[in-house]
UniProtKB/Swiss-Prot annotation:
Annotated GO MF terms: glycylpeptide N-tetradecanoyltransferase activity
Chief localisation class: cytoplasm
The protein's name in its UniProt record: Glycylpeptide N-tetradecanoyltransferase
Binding residues for tetradecanoyl-CoA: 34-35, 163-166, 174-176
SUPFAM superfamilies documented for this protein: Acyl-CoA N-acyltransferases (Nat) (SSF55729)
Amino acid sequence: MADDKKKQLEESKRLVELFKASSLASKKPKGHEFWDTQPVPKIDDKIIESGPIENKTLDDVRKDPLTLPPAFEWIELDCNKPEELKEIYTLLYENYVEDDDNMFRFDYSPEFLKWALQPPGFLKEWHIGVRVVESKKLVGFISGIPATIRVEGKPITMVEINFLCVHKKLREKRLAPVLIKEVTRRVNLRNIWQAAYTAGVVLPKPVAICKYWHRSIKQQKLVEVGFSAIPPKMTMASMVKLYRINDEMKHPLRPLTKEDVPSFKVLLDDYLSKYKIAPEFTTDEDVWHWFETRKDVITCYVKVDESTKKVTDAFSFYNLPSTIIGNAKHNTLKAAFSFYNVATTMSITDLVGDALVTAKKMDYDVFNCLDVFENSTFFKDLKFAVGDGDLQYYLYNYSTPTKKSSEIGLVLL
């Protein structure tokens, strides 16, 4: 073990030395220096109309990859190769999103990453890594997937950008902007000029600022790991009683089947048309990819009208556990994240209540939800508590007036 730690320390020092010798480390950016060069609105811009910020053609796009220092190289990662999928997993597991107190770190499973990175029409060239030439160690990653996103009623071909991750020892070395520029270049070469992304930090300029809400399922565990606390004048026993979830669903919902997809797509399309920013699932294949129940990845239940055989209601949530850092008793927090929910024959409160029952049966610790869609209407009745984290939504090379969180109909993983 001591030898392993020594090797890791030496490798980390070596990474920093390699970057110190490179041009990328020559100047530390200040403020939003990088974003001020990009086609995004400035923080204090007052936006009245929607539309592209700059119009380019393929002739304007650099044909060769951006230059990296000699010690580093670009790579396209193939999620169908287990060893390359494991490299992405390891980089994210060791270096990706942690909470502000460094108590929890997202743990995206390899199966989840395959689902997130390989929808219909995905391109391997948009799964971009940076390796150390000598050791072949993956030290940076960014991904894009194709999407059609409707903004103010207008469908736009975009990419969803996700999983931007740089090795901890190379933070502040200006590698993230290079990754962003390179994925932008490759996307532009496909004649796509807009993107959607989210971040826990404020950059120029959020199109919406959304809040996370949390519903406790296993109260005792959540207190033991520091995720929540016992409220004043309550005991653990009274807290457990207060947050008890029913054992059985109120309504006859079952997992989505392939036969349900055409009518489920109609239901989903109609529901999403109400929102100012929302995806368009263009084919049945898209819908089946994103909503087919996959163990430890995504769960989708539907209610079907027995006479018409049409889907009338649906809930879905995805599985995103977190590693618990430095807790002697627990090492994983099993969290369900609300995805897309549509209620037409029952209240949205009853529908999500049944989702909570399902999550409880599946042994989740907590159910997380953004205040997008109409979600804020059920938070009080279902005993959700507001979290301390915000999630900012952004559009690249597209400006549109700032939206309320309830006007957003899009969930990015």
